[in-house]
């Protein structure tokens, strides 16, 4: 069986994602397409607009055969760590190919990944505080390999390639040309494709959802209209309270709170009247907005280095949904994988020290804002066919 994996957030799922699912299956001649999808929090440190179960069902409705959750410890990380967790999970699921969108589909990612892992380790030398880590890494790659990585999906593709090259048995890499809208585009035009960030902006600004009907499937439009959406504005009062109430010593214990960043948080928090104002006040040449957003989320959820270290050691496969073809693969996977396959969360699993302890803890925040239980009493979605799915 030919199995192709896709790494995604679907925040939210739109026409560009459907195109990628179709092209991944077609170009790799896949019998099965598995999506490794971020849970309720995404790579840039934000809560997803829609919960993971809704997004998984939308993926199944639009071409995925199986959807598994990328754990928080990998999902809310810089590109290299995000890629490592996702690629390793897809390899464990039996994928032979990883498909991803790229602005440079003819680029040889396979070769670049191998070249990069053969380079000497340089990250410790990136100490220019007038530049972000990503900028310094890009300059290093350009100097050593003449690689110019100035587009977000190209950077992610390189990260996938490096993580893949480190596998004992690397997978095939399939870069699919992005259609029209680029990652980060902030406008929705009359074209059938728009970036996820442009779509989120329409939703969060209160614009009529009818403006999106030509760029998202009907299921996404209905979910956005019917679901309880979780935005930064809703989380802001709680984040402000957390920053103001924690001492410097306590802030210093937060994951990725380094280089004296805790002092900056304390200095600017009293002047900030919104999440956006806080980020603008925190921003320096050293930190990207994505890095600051992740740290804010770590503060909000009280994520400490030990949480991440323990989470990375608790490897498992968390099923969110599958169709009949995915179910057939699941039966075979149970015979071959050493990883626990989780379809139901028991009280023991969900305890603080349990296999899914961290996921249960971070998802509780979403549940406080009206989302249904995200772990207990939930079963994987079995998608039978068009417009029919059962949990």
UniProtKB/Swiss-Prot annotation:
InterPro entries: Rossmann-like_a/b/a_fold, tRNA(Met)_cyd_acetate_ligase. Signal peptide: none annotated. Its main location: cytoplasm. Keywords: ATP-binding, Cytoplasm, Ligase, Nucleotide-binding, RNA-binding, tRNA processing, tRNA-binding. The lineage of its organism: Bacteria, Bacillati, Bacillota, Bacilli, Lactobacillales. Belongs to the TmcAL family. It is found in: Cytoplasm. NCBIfam families: PRK13670.1. The keyword ATP-binding applies. Coiled coil: none annotated. The keyword Ligase applies. It holds the Pfam family HIGH_NTase1. Its EC number is 6.3.4.-. It catalyses: cytidine(34) in elongator tRNA(Met) + acetate + ATP = N(4)-acetylcytidine(34) in elongator tRNA(Met) + AMP + diphosphate. ATP binds at residues 7-20, 101, 153, 178. It is an enzyme of class 6 (ligase). This is tRNA(Met) cytidine acetate ligase. GO terms for cellular component: cytoplasm. It comes from Latilactobacillus sakei subsp. sakei (strain 23K) (Lactobacillus sakei subsp. sakei). GO terms for molecular function: ATP binding; ligase activity, forming carbon-nitrogen bonds; tRNA binding. GO terms for biological process: tRNA modification. Disulfide bonds: none annotated. PANTHER family: TRNA(MET) CYTIDINE ACETATE LIGASE. Transmembrane segments: none annotated. Catalyzes the formation of N(4)-acetylcytidine (ac(4)C) at the wobble position of elongator tRNA(Met), using acetate and ATP as substrates. First activates an acetate ion to form acetyladenylate (Ac-AMP) and then transfers the acetyl group to tRNA to form ac(4)C34.
């Amino acid at each position: 069986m030919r199995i192709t994996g896709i790494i995604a957030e679907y925040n939210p799922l739109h026409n560009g994602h459907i195109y990628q699912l179709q092209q991944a299956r077609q170009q790799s001649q896949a019998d099965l397409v598995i999506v490794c999808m971020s849970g309720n929090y995404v790579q840039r440190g934000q809560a997803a607009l829609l919960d993971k179960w809704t997004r998984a069902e939308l993926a199944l409705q639009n071409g995925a055969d199986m959807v598994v959750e990328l754990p928080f410890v990998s999902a809310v990380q810089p590109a290299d760590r995000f890629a490592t967790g996702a690629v390793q999970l897809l390899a464990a699921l039996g994928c032979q190919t990883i498909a991803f969108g790229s602005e440079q589909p003819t680029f040889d990612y396979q070769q670049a990944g191998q070249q990069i892992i053969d380079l000497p380790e340089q990250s410790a030398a990136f100490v220019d505080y007038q530049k972000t880590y990503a900028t310094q890494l890009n300059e290093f790659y350009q100097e050593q390999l003449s690689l110019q990585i100035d587009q977000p999906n190209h950077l992610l593709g390189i990260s996938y390639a490096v993580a893949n090259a480190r596998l004992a048995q690397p997978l095939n890499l399939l870069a699919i040309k992005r259609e029209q809208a680029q990652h980060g585009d902030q406008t929705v035009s009359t074209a059938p494709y728009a970036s996820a960030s442009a779509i989120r902006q329409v939703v969060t600004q209160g614009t009529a959802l009818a403006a999106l009907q030509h760029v998202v499937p009907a299921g996404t439009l209905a979910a956005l209209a019917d679901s309880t959406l979780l935005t930064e504005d809703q989380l802001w009062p709680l984040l402000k309270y957390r920053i103001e109430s924690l001492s410097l010593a306590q802030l210093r214990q937060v994951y990725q709170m380094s280089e004296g960043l805790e002092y900056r948080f304390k200095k600017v928090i009293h002047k900030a009247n919104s999440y956006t104002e806080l980020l603008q006040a925190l921003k320096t040449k050293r930190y990207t907005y994505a890095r600051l957003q992740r740290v804010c989320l770590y503060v909000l959820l009280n994520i400490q280095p030990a949480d991440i270290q323990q989470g990375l050691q608790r490897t498992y496969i968390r099923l969110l949904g599958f169709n009949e073809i995915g179910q057939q693969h699941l039966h075979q996977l149970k015979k071959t994988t050493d990883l626990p396959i989780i379809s139901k969360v028991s009280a023991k699993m969900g305890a603080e020290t349990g296999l899914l302890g961290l996921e249960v803890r971070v998802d509780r925040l979403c549940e406080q804002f009206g989302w249904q239980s995200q772990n207990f009493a939930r079963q994987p979605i079995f998608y039978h066919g068009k417009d029919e799915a059962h949990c």
